[in-house]
Amino acid sequence: VRFMTMIKMDETALSSETPPGVYEAMGAFAQEGRVNGTLVELGGLMPSSAGAIVSLANGRIKAVDGPFAEARELVGGYAVIDVRSREEAVELGRRLMQIHLDNWPGWEGSCEIRQIAGS
């Protein structure tokens, strides 16, 4: 079953320097997932200043360039995983949060886990 995990964090954390330990631990996590077949794709996202939002409201399509001042939390990274169950997906989400806890003092955020339709 495939799931998308989305690491959500405050925009200021996205704009600050990520400690090297996070990259090292994420690299090990990614390598393990590639070897055991659970990791499909993994990536980090740039701050919202490098993005845009395209929306549809009241019959009109509008594009707004970042940064997104009204957003409290933004997705800073993601992983697509292929696991046997929702419980296994949650366990991998816990591991992603543990990487941040162990390597980024003061970091706060969440890992949203959503099953991919049709998987």
Task: List the predicted regions and their residue ranges.
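Conserved, structured core segments of small domains
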Residues: V1-S119
